[in-house]
Curated annotation (Swiss-Prot):
Region (Interaction with HCFC1): 628-794
GO biological-process terms attached to the record: ectoderm development; G1 to G0 transition; gastrulation with mouth forming second; negative regulation of cell population proliferation; positive regulation of DNA-templated transcription
Pfam families xrefs: BTB, zf-C2H2
Gene designation: Zbtb17
Compositionally biased region (Pro residues): 784-794
Bias-annotated ranges (Low complexity): 203-216
Taxonomic path: Eukaryota, Metazoa, Chordata, Craniata, Vertebrata
UniProt PTM: Undergoes 'Lys-48'-linked polyubiquitination at Lys-388 and Lys-472 and subsequent proteasomal degradation in a TRAF2-dependent manner and upon TNFA stimulation.
PANTHER family: ZINC FINGER AND BTB DOMAIN-CONTAINING, ZINC FINGER AND BTB DOMAIN-CONTAINING PROTEIN 17
BTB domain span: 1-104
Protein source organism: Mus musculus
The protein's name in its UniProt record: Zinc finger and BTB domain-containing protein 17
Skewed-composition ranges (Basic and acidic residues): 132-142, 243-252
Region (Disordered): 116-285, 769-794
Gene null: resulting phenotype: Mice produce inviable embryos which are severely retarded in early development and do not undergo normal gastrulation due to massive apoptosis of ectodermal cells around day 7.5.
Amino acid sequence: MDFPQHSQRVLEQLNQQRQLGLLCDCTFVVDGVDFKAHKAVLAACSEYFKMLFVDQKDVVHLDISNAAGLGQVLEFMYTAKLSLSPENVDDVLAVASFLQMQDIVTACHTLKSLAEPSSTTGESADASAVEGGDKRAKDEKAAATMLSRLDQARGSSSTGPGRELKEERGGQAESASSGAEQTEKADAPREPPPVELKPDPTSSMAAAEAEALSESSEQEMEVEPASKGEDGQEEEGAGPATVKEEGMHLDNGEPPEENEESAGTDSGQELGMEGQNLRSGTYGDRTESKAYGSIIHKCEDCGKEFTHTGNFKRHIRIHTGEKPFSCRECSKAFSDPAACKAHEKTHSPLKPYGCEECGKSYRLISLLNLHKKRHSGEARYRCGDCGKLFTTSGNLKRHQLVHSGQKPYQCDYCGRSFSDPTSKMRHLETHDTDKEHKCPHCDKKFNQVGNLKAHLKIHIADGPLKCRECGKQFTTSGNLKRHLRIHSGEKPYVCTHCQRQFADPGALQRHVRIHTGEKPCQCVICGKAFTQASSLIAHVRQHTGEKPYVCERCGKRFVQSSQLANHIRHHDNIRPHKCSVCSKAFVNVGDLSKHIIIHTGEKPYLCDKCGRGFNRVDNLRSHVKTVHQGKAGIKILEPEEGGEVSVVTVDDMVTLATEALAATAVTQLTVVPVGAAVTADETEVLKAEISKAVKQVQEEDPNTHILYACDSCGDKFLDANSLAQHVRIHTAQALVMFQTDADFYQQYGPGSTWPAGQMLQAGELVFRPRDGTEGQPTLAESPPTAPDCLPPAE
């Protein structure tokens, strides 16, 4: 017993599995779009895939450069339909030629020949031949013959631009023609309509089967020329595609400067295509380039909405903690396939294929071949902003995101965006905080064994990335290249403003911001801007209280890795900073700077009772306690009528006066001078005044962040202790200004004036809100006299 519909139903089921991403063992990634498929179907339809999969290669680099063409070819493999139009014929032809699918190649050539413009508008297709008309007439004759056979097989005599062509299929399909009739009417459009290519039945069973397929397909899909704005539109490719086993996502494209290849990721963005409908019963897990549907998937946990089932599934794993993707080498689990693939690549960090022209090495021979196009002149896509050349238009488009500032690749975990998929993949690894792989040489830890292997290169005596001058090891060729400039003295990057030269382009970029005043890295909490991202990161951690760097020996935490490294030197008693005068060594340069004061004779810390100077603040405090019995320098302050008394002693003036500087979005707390004198003691009054002012501000606005401000450079801190530690870099300026009238007034500069009758005794201070005394000048309102101080970069 025969079942005529069986083969059709099997193919339909395979197509549904492909559209839903079920049981697919192969995935293409072209221009950021995933194409899922079955190896068996690919091998049955393409001689190229048949030979490819016989070799059992898991990851193969293909020279396929457009998503639109690949989508049409895959659609043909599973549905026996090929929607050709003048807009997509070049894309389809390029893919079909590469995959050795001769039937599609012939159909594309036929359509292109029919699409050539006629010499006379009103003439029929037979009489409107252009140059090379003999060939075209031959093609049209062949098309007419095929149409006649198709009409006989189907029992149909339908004509017109919308007819569907069928081709005979015996293992491999025969060539097919376009859907335009040879005897087209004069008033019909000259541009041939889209063509649907179907198999021709060769038996009665096949005829019935094809008839049913034809009827269902006519109801299912309306054939139209590709329109702009849809996902299926013609688009320049982004570079070679990658075929691999399911769950492994590799992007196409040219290898970046420091990495052997770019790995594709899912952007995590909801690319809504409003008003466009998916074919009934499909969900599109970022599949081929068709219009996405209006199906909305809403997360019940957080309310986030998605139009792609695949992105929705990946997002759900954030809440469930599911990690279905595992490394084939070490079995480590991941929730995102892109992160898994990035991890797997670290198991084989060697790059055996080297470029003879420049020496750059790659992991895959296909990537080396792509790179060689730069030297051969095939890299014809040039960036208009920086002049850099690319071998594919897709790579150029991704590169231009750097100049435009667009960041289309978003992390599903934290929402952070990236301009390229490789950066996103590296970022995904940071969400895996388990660092169980420890370096036996330096105790450094890694969350992946591949990263540990790459790190071990620096300990190998004869590693592949070793500096021949000093023997230092590196994990990437780019880092070694930059390091070699230290020995050669090469500084190829020149500032156009001051002609200063730099060995690294990033250093030049940061330097130029000094001239332009650009501070692109802005804190979203307080609005402060920085010239570089590392300074902003350190600053934001002051707001959040985050201290991610922990000392394993004592448990102390730090904001920056450089602070932790400096702290570890104390444990190891490493003192790299030596005094040039006495050779005494110090852990950090700050301690050395304080020590040098001994040799220079500078005494910035003054007693305002007797005027004696000291080179250290603790010596000043000791002097006050012993010589003046701890009472010297107490300032007797007379409050204004109805006000409160606040007292500052010399003993605590050095620290408390700087700690007292505070700022918020609501009010400014600062030190101001007053007129007469009353008796009081103890500095706790000043602390109480600070607490009262802070409490008042927070009562008015509970969301207010109290920031303690440095009067010299304007930097703000979350607590007074941090401010006090920071202020040491200003020593004479920030501290001495409280000691004498002259120094105090100099802080305002020659252009500032004081209200008449306000000559004060030295160091008399009171702590008040800025708006507490109208018209009275404050330190915070004075122009800064010290240069901007940025937090140290990591």
